[in-house]
Amino acid sequence: MGAATPITAAPPELPDLLALWLPAQRWFAGKGRDFVVEEMSALGILTERPWRSDVWLVRVRYRDSATETYQVPLVRRPEPADQVTHVLVGETPDPDYGGRSWWYDALHDKEVTGAWLTGIAEGRKEGMLGFVPGSHPEELPLDATSLVITGEQSNTSLVFDDAAILKVFRRVYVGRNPDIEVHRALSELEGGARHVARLLGHVEAHWSQPDGSPAEADLAMLQEYFRTATDGWELAKISVRDLYAEADLHASEVGGDFAGEAFRLGQATAEVHADLARALPTGTLGAAALTARAGQMQQRLDDAVAVVPELEDYAGGLREAFRALGAHQPGVPVQRVHGDYHLGQVLRTSHRWVVLDFEGEPAKPLSERTGLDSPVRDLAGMLRSFDYAARHLLADHPFEPQLAYRADEWAARNRDAFLDGYVDAGGPDPREDPVLLHAYEADKAVYEAVYEARNRPSWLPIPLASLARLIEGARS
């Protein structure tokens, strides 16, 4: 990404401070890699009072010469601030600002975060920043205070008085963010999209690159917030804990049976896929495209084996599954899909399931995340999530066969219920095309194995055991 023309010059000490601070942030993708902060550019001023706050683009360069660009809104204070000590980036000399400045992550500073809402409501233009209101800016809670949601991996989200949620994209790519693109398209459908949150506004940036060509990127999106909703992962975990507490009962006999919700989630997923197909382009995969798709999966497997040697035991069966996809009959329907679908990406409100985060897998290039794909990718992702929900607690009980048996039963029951709901709402049954389903599930499990090896080694047996079952199922 080309740098913006600087509005505010960064103190010479600030890049080195950020180089120390960035690896500790959950959303920073370069953990464990050597890098330098190569460039900092300010896009525009968020606030000047009570404290100066700017939106910065920070470009890092790794030892292998790869680069990434991050959005880092910073607030500069003339003295330490106890309420934001936990997000202190560092202090620098500053003769123009009382002698020294203390720099903090501005998204955690409640004295300045309201500027995001005000900017969207007013449609402000500030420097290279553009604040774009949704269809009802008068509904925005301009006097609200913000609360940062914990647990996010790749973005930072702020809730404003349980009325709206602002998702700030930390990793910045030139071009339209797929989450905003999808929500805008769905909002234009007649009647809207019942299972997707309303888009209330967004923030974008426009600048000139070093060669003079124009560039744009999306920085944040504002949506309605569902105060009393619970995410699907938490609900599923409660059901699994109930099952483990009464392991002598079948999954269907336990009070916290999840199959009804899984069925309704399948219905909601089919409706969302239908809405996406109405609002955005569709197509089919011909023979060459299927071969290419299988080749991508094969390459991901080869790369993964280098990181997770345990995958070599399954590589032969996985290659068979991917070769079968390459030889699949042409004409596989494709469309825009969610791309990173799992139980943590859905909310259960008092009335319905709501689907969140249409960004796709953050680590993939933007062109791949915005491309057309089979809806089976989403179905496979959710099926894998049911496996995780059933088995993640087994990491603490590895030698209890009764619990393992019940976990298998819970996963199978809810996987089937989810797909039954999908078919009930008009979606095609992926079980009638096992080659497609096995390939997408295997591709997802390979991705999971790499993630667990790097982040949660005790969970690595979950995707490995799933791969063994997938290979056996594909061969049978």
Tell me the role of every PLM-derived stretch:
Residues R33-R49, L57-R59, E204, L325-G326:
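Short amphipathic beta-strand and strand-loop transition segments with alternating hydrophobic
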Residues S53-D302, H351-R352, L356-D408, A412, ...:
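Conserved ATP-binding subdomain of kinase catalytic cores across diverse folds
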Residues L285-R323, E409, R413-A425, V450:
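Active-site catalytic-loop/activation-segment of kinase and kinase-like phosphoryl-transfer enzymes
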Residues Q335-V337:
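Conserved catalytic-core element of eukaryotic-like protein kinases
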Residues D340:
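Conserved catalytic-loop position in the HRD/HxD motif
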Residues Y405-R431, V435, A439-S476:
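ATP/Mg2+ or Mg2+-diphosphate-binding catalytic cores
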